[in-house]
A protein has these predicted regions:
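Acidic, low-complexity intrinsically disordered regions
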Residues: 14, 110-114, 155, 171
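Conserved small/polar residues in nucleotide/adenosyl-binding loops
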Residues: 1-6
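Short, Lys/Arg-rich N-terminal segment immediately upstream of the first membrane anchor
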Residues: 7-21
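Short low-polarity hydrophobic stretches
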Residues: 19-20, 96, 124
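Core segments of small alpha/beta cavity-forming domains
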Residues: 36-111, 115-116
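Exposed beta-sheet edge and beta->alpha loop/turn motif
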Residues: 120-188
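Hydrophobic membrane-insertion alpha-helices, especially the h-region
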Residues: 22-40
């Protein structure tokens, strides 16, 4: 009888251990998925903010001659040095230099992308559009522009809509845009 009781007790002990182990495994898997989901959402949100704010700031530097030192919050310094539109704006050769730009309607669309919590590089396809620019030619140039190009020259030229492949890198816990490669120029 004693051996039978021990086997009977061992059977219940084994069932109890397997029950606890299976529940711990399920809880661990659920917690792992929650942590992965949290870090995915955090990375996607940070990348979204960096791209939207960075591309808007880039357009402001090009059109409104804003301070270009703000771009380092969003872009790597090496990219800023290679970006011809930003460099032309800094040098005073922007197509918008003779215009007082008061505002713009900046729009950025992003495709779906996946970033694992441990990833330090992200690739995103974006479409940048600026359908409306609020501004006029500076007073000193108004008569000259109207004489040379007609009345439509009083308003700033349209921004070329583009589709880009953007590569972002995570440096010191912050995402920065490393490169923008033009995929295609889009109709405005």
């Amino acid at each position: 009888m004693c051996i039978r009781d021990r086997e009977y007790n061992m059977q219940y002990l084994r069932r109890l251990v397997w029950y606890i182990a299976s529940r711990l495994l399920v809880i661990t898997l659920v917690l792992g998925l929650m942590v992965t989901g949290f870090y995915y959402a955090m990375n996607v949100t940070n990348i979204n903010v960096v791209l939207k704010d960075g591309m808007a700031r880039r357009a402001q530097v090009i059109m409104m001659t804003e301070d270009s030192s703000e771009l380092t919050k969003y872009f790597q310094e090496s990219f800023i040095q290679r970006d011809p539109q930003v460099q032309n704006a800094i040098a005073g050769y922007s197509a918008y230099k003779d215009y007082n730009i008061r505002g713009m309607d900046h729009r950025l669309e992003m495709s779906f992308f996946w970033v694992w919590p441990w990833d330090t590089v992200a690739r995103v396809t974006i479409v940048e559009r600026i359908p409306r620019i609020d501004g006029r030619v500076k007073g000193a140039y108004a008569d000259q522009y109207v004489a040379e190009q007609g009345a439509s020259a009083l308003y700033p030229p349209a921004w070329q809509s583009m589709k880009y492949n953007a590569i972002l890198v995570k440096e010191s816990g912050k995402w920065h845009i490393r490169s923008l490669t033009v995929v295609e120029a889009l109709a405005n």
